[in-house]
Amino acid sequence: MEDKNSVIVFKNVSFQYQSDASFTLKDVSFSIPKGQWTSIVGHNGSGKSTIAKLMIGIEKVKSGEIFYNNQTITDDNFEKLRKDIGIVFQNPDNQFVGSIVKYDVAFGLENHAVPHDEMHRRVGEALKQVDMLERADYEPNALSGGQKQRVAIASVLALNPSVIILDEATSMLDPDARQNLLDLVRKVKSEHNITIISITHDLSEAMEADHVIVMNKGTVYKEGTAIEIFDHAEELTTIGLDLPFPIKINQMLGYQTSFLTYEGLVDQL
């Protein structure tokens, strides 16, 4: 398969957790554009988190194919390809493995047998990028949820990935911490040309994305830019998704534009 503009491609992928269970994913096909931010959204049970598990190899497809940089992912090449993909999970406490911040960032580098001098350099650079260098010697219980997620992103950045997956990474944060983390992710994407994949039920997060895939009942319901997706805002509510606040207000006021950020809403008012 030749698709130079996509980093990950799902082709007719189906998956079930048990052989006698219903399919969680049903003949799913989509492409993740290189260097862009793709948001995969859906309600609980839509199949979006299963997609993340397949991307990082926690689960394997039952039928269909997954391509990474035009290579079919197989048992033989998976470990090599997997090193290019980092993931940040929902609960920051569950992914903190070091006794202090800098040891947590170093953990993945140790597993990859990175030399000590290079490890020290990478840890410092990664923490600096996420504005956590001054807290390098802090214990995890001294950090807020948002700061822990910054450390998780630093741990991923230290490994020089091409792709970062955010699996509901903002869902346990307060609104300010959530927005700060999303701003950081956009900065990281821009500075390093990293592909971002956010798995979320929150359509507000999808407004940050370049490309949006909406999942429903194990299938791709809609796909397009954020503007294209929110042009069908009412349809999104019928599959259990909650519209972002500015779009709700926009509808109440009877404005024509479906897609609207907080800044745009303020300007419009």
UniProtKB/Swiss-Prot annotation:
Residues reported in the UniProt entry to bind ATP: G42, H43, N44, G45, S46, G47, K48, S49
PROSITE patterns, per database record: ABC_TRANSPORTER_1, ABC_TRANSPORTER_2, CBIO
Gene Ontology annotations for the cellular component aspect, listed alphabetically: ATP-binding cassette (ABC) transporter complex
Pfam families: ABC_tran
Keyword match Translocase: yes
SUPFAM superfamilies xrefs: P-loop containing nucleoside triphosphate hydrolases
InterPro entries xrefs: AAA+_ATPase, ABC_transporter-like_ATP-bd, ABC_transporter-like_CS, ABC_transpr_CbiO/EcfA_su, ECF_ABC_transporter_ATP-bd, EcfA_1, P-loop_NTPase
Molecular function via GO: ATP binding; ATP hydrolysis activity; ATPase-coupled transmembrane transporter activity
Keywords on record: ATP-binding, Cell membrane, Membrane, Nucleotide-binding, Translocase, Transport
Function field: ATP-binding (A) component of a common energy-coupling factor (ECF) ABC-transporter complex. Unlike classic ABC transporters this ECF transporter provides the energy necessary to transport a number of different substrates.
Entry's family note: Belongs to the ABC transporter superfamily. Energy-coupling factor EcfA family.
Subunit structure: Forms a stable energy-coupling factor (ECF) transporter complex composed of 2 membrane-embedded substrate-binding proteins (S component), 2 ATP-binding proteins (A component) and 2 transmembrane proteins (T component).
Name of the molecule in the record: Energy-coupling factor transporter ATP-binding protein EcfA1
Species this chain originates from: Staphylococcus aureus (strain MSSA476)
